[in-house]
Amino acid sequence: EALAAFITRAAQAADLSPGMFKVVNMTCSTISKTTHLVIGRSAKKMDLTQNQAAADYMDQVRHPATDGDHWYVAFPVSEAHCAQCKDVIRLCQEGEEDKARRELAAYLLTLTDEAIDWYFQRPMALLGFGPVLRKVANVGVETTRKASRSLISNLIPKLGPEQLLASAQYQESMLLSFPPRTR
């Protein structure tokens, strides 16, 4: 679901060409296979304490929607980072596409690093993997990072003005505000 929200739906919102969409799907497939490999290897070996730590962490990143019908899995994004996303929209509307492309790429690269931290590195640190599982997990994280960075670096420069604006607007729509959680 996270891949669909962050990558696939973003690509659909930008109305990418079939060739560019194929690259997006290949990247998602690589990340998905890598993630399943890491989860498949580690889940079988987790003890009760590790399972409890994983469940507690998942509860921290789960936020109820205002309608109460569903939940979001989300991580905090700084105000400066939110402003950078909004600035991309402004640059697009002012016709400064080259600068908007650079800003969108920078925004997405930072967002990727944050997502990897929240969705991979923090949970792995909680689980206290041994050396073999830690190595498998680290390879998975770096594969995900490289695939994501490659997609951003290759895709953003090719976006036309309308695609660029649509992509920035989609990214902005992903920025949600949640009330503080209490247990």
Specify the residue positions occupied by each region the protein language model found.
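Protein-protein interaction and targeting regions used for scaffolding, dimerization, and localization
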Residues: E1-R183
